[in-house]
Amino acid sequence: MIPLPATTKIWLACGATDMRKGFDGLAVLVQQSLKQSPHSGALFAFRGRRGDLIKLLWYDGQGLCLFSKRMDRGRFVWPVTATEAVHLTPAQLSMLLEGIDWRRPERTFPTGLGQPSLAG
């Protein structure tokens, strides 16, 4: 993933998006549906109906960037909500792009088993 500035806001456009849309079509969705400017510096994420394709639209200060990722297996976890957009943190975006359920991340090891032993 291209490193984003720490101040970048990240928005998921809820619902399914027509993945045939490119720069202009997604920019119009940002303006009309999300009521934001595609040139604000925020990153906007869109998911297709099948759930295996995601597109990210981001203005880097020089122009619009459009990134896409298609999962070979599985689907991207997407919110089911009546709102038009959901805010994510950079860590949640990283989990989303890796196919991890960013809403309820879980540890892969048990907790509460005491302190690790010291080497030596």
Where do the model's predicted regions map?
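Polybasic/polar functional segments that serve as interface/processing modules
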Residues: 1-120
